Amino acid sequence: MITGSIVAIVTPMHEDGSLDLNSFRNLLDFHVQEGTDAIVVVGTTGESPTVNVEEHCELIKIAVDHVAGRIPVIAGTGANSTAEAIELTEFAKKAGANMALSVVPYYNKPTQEGLYRHFKAIAEAVELPVILYNVPGRTVADMSNDTILRLAEVPGIVGVKDATGNIDRACDLIARAPKDFALYTGDDMTAVATISLGFHGDISVTANVAPRLMHEMCVAAASGDIAKAREIHFKVLALHRDLFCEANPIPVKWAVHKLGLMPNGIRLPLTTLSEANQPRVLAALRQAGLVA
């Protein structure tokens, strides 16, 4: 089971929106060197809705090949079409990804039975461990804990990323999930709380700019060193908050750019961070000790 801080890595782009694959490789090295425990590539933060299928597959392949087994690579393979999700998951397996992260289908609003059949079909079609991803703030459809736990019994479905930020729901999953079913928060703000209670890790946006701190925070929370986890939490608290001052990944891409790690490119319909919010994100980077 993968534990700790798992970065939901951004996808570097030039200012014209084209992929910057050299910066992408450098970012992968940066995370390996800074202690990130695993990498999710082409997830929400990686702008999966605005890369085409060819680019999506290219990014997965580059990540797997460049990381070369140094840490696990989890491929974002979700889609609002079951057939497309299966195709992406099949590619991830062939590319050598360790796992797939598959988001709840968005826009078409499936029922709980539809969600069950969707993820079951993926797991049955491809022999690659699948992590479910529930983020109702984006997908509208909200996968219930009952459906998650029903899917936990399906061979090949090995965990869930719960991005609801709801502690009550997290506690219910901890109490009822099989012991070998991985529980990850997708909400940095509640990472210390959920990991302290029994979650296994954090699939993190903040880790894009503070990988070492997020790794240390997750390790401290998991080991019961609440004083250290609390200290780091408050050091990065403004990042947890202000990296969402506009829609993710707008603020975090600007922040990674300010650290000198990539150009300031993003694809429409997303636009770069507004001038009004730039001082806010810069102040959060300063509070975390990441810039002077």
Curated annotation (Swiss-Prot):
Record EC number: 4.3.3.7
Catalytic reaction annotation: L-aspartate 4-semialdehyde + pyruvate = (2S,4S)-4-hydroxy-2,3,4,5-tetrahydrodipicolinate + H2O + H(+)
Site (Part of a proton relay during catalysis): T44, Y107
Pfam families found in the cross-reference section: DHDPS (PF00701)
GO biological process terms on file: diaminopimelate biosynthetic process; lysine biosynthetic process via diaminopimelate
Domain of life (superkingdom): Bacteria
PROSITE patterns, sorted: DHDPS_1, DHDPS_2
SMART domains in the cross-refs: DHDPS
Pathway of action: Amino-acid biosynthesis; L-lysine biosynthesis via DAP pathway; (S)-tetrahydrodipicolinate from L-aspartate: step 3/4
A single MF term (Gene Ontology): 4-hydroxy-tetrahydrodipicolinate synthase activity
CDD domains in the record: DHDPS
GO cellular component, one term: cytosol
Subcellular location per the Swiss-Prot or TrEMBL entry: Cytoplasm
Residues reported to bind pyruvate: T45, I203
Functional description taken from the UniProt entry: Catalyzes the condensation of (S)-aspartate-beta-semialdehyde [(S)-ASA] and pyruvate to 4-hydroxy-tetrahydrodipicolinate (HTPA).
Xref: NCBIfam families: dapA (TIGR00674)
Family according to the record: Belongs to the DapA family.
PANTHER family: 4-HYDROXY-2-OXOGLUTARATE ALDOLASE, MITOCHONDRIAL, DIHYDRODIPICOLINATE SYNTHASE
Subunit note: Homotetramer; dimer of dimers.
Protein name in UniProt: 4-hydroxy-tetrahydrodipicolinate synthase
Protein species of origin: Dechloromonas aromatica (strain RCB)
Gene: dapA
